[in-house]
C-alpha cells in the first residue's frame, strides 16, 4: 500500500502537530515552513478544515483514498461521525502496536507489522490497517522475539503509558484488547468536527 515517505518534520511544521513523537526539530520550530518566527497568516475556514483532515491522515499514516473510506464508514455508523472516525483509526493494528509501547512511532509500528512480526489470535498479520476487535490477542511471533528491538521494547514497557483499553504482558509482549476505545480515552490533538465539516461540503 502506498504511504507518505517524505520529510516528516516539514509536514509536522506545516500541520502544526508532532507527527513523529518527540521530534526535537519540530519542537524548536513549531510553525509552518516559510513563516518567520511565530507570525501567522489568516487562514480561510476551508484551509483550516483541510489542515485538520491532513493532520489526521499523516498522524495515522493513511492515504487519501483510504481515509475517505474510513470517513464513509464512520458516517454510516450510529453515533457521532467524528468520534467514529477517530475510533476506527485507533483500531488499526499499527496504531495498537504503537499505543502498547512496542514501537516508538506509528511509522515504526507500520514497518514492524508489514514485516510480519505479529500474530492476531494466532494468525500472522502483515497488514498495518488490519482492524482489531474487542478481546483480540496480539503476539510477537516466536521467530521475531530474538530481535534486539523487542528486547529493548520489553525493557521500556516498565515506563510505557499504555491506554486503559489495552493491556500488555511485559514477560511475553502479548497485547490484550479489552475493548475498542471511546473518544474520551484517545489522547490526540485532533478536532475531528472540522474533518466532518470538510467532507460535508
UniProtKB/Swiss-Prot annotation:
SMART domains: Ribosomal_S4, S4. GO terms for cellular component: small ribosomal subunit. It comes from the Bacteria. InterPro entries: Ribosomal_uS4, Ribosomal_uS4_bac-type, Ribosomal_uS4_CS, Ribosomal_uS4_N, S4_RNA-bd, S4_RNA-bd_sf. GO terms for molecular function: rRNA binding; structural constituent of ribosome. Pfam families: Ribosomal_S4 (PF00163), S4 (PF01479). GO terms for biological process: ribosomal small subunit biogenesis; translation. Gene3D superfamilies: Ribosomal Protein S4 Delta 41, Chain A, domain 1, RNA-binding S4 domain. NCBIfam families: PRK05327.1, rpsD_bact. Part of the 30S ribosomal subunit. Contacts protein S5. The interaction surface between S4 and S5 is involved in control of translational fidelity. This is Small ribosomal subunit protein uS4. It comes from Corynebacterium urealyticum (strain ATCC 43042 / DSM 7109).
Amino acid at each position: 500500500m502506498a504511504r507518505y515517505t517524505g520529510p516528516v518534520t516539514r509536514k509536522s511544521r506545516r500541520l502544526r502537530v508532532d507527527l513523529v513523537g518527540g521530534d526535537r526539530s519540530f519542537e524548536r520550530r513549531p510553525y509552518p515552513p516559510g513563516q518567520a518566527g511565530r507570525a501567522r497568516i489568516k487562514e480561510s475556514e476551508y484551509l483550516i478544515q483541510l489542515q485538520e483532515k491532513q493532520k489526521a491522515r499523516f498522524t495515522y499514516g493513511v492515504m487519501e483514498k483510504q481515509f475517505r473510506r474510513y470517513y464513509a464508514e464512520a458516517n454510516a455508523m450510529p453515533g457521532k461521525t467524528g468520534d467514529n472516525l477517530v475510533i476506527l483509526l485507533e483500531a488499526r493494528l499499527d496504531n495498537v502496536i504503537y499505543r502498547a509501547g512496542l514501537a516508538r512511532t506509528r511509522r515504526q509500528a507500520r514497518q514492524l507489522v508489514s514485516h510480519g512480526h505479529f500474530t492476531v489470535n494466532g494468525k500472522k498479520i502483515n497488514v498495518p490497517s488490519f482492524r482489531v476487535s474487542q478481546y483480540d490477542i496480539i503476539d510477537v511471533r516466536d521467530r521475531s522475539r530474538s530481535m534486539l528491538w523487542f528486547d529493548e521494547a520489553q525493557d521500556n514497557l516498565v515506563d510505557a503509558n499504555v491506554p486503559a483499553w489495552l493491556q500488555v504482558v511485559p514477560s511475553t509482549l502479548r497485547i490484550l484488547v479489552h475493548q475498542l476505545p471511546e473518544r474520551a480515552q484517545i489522547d490526540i490533538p485532533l478536532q475531528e468536527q472540522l474533518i466532518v465539516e470538510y467532507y460535508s461540503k
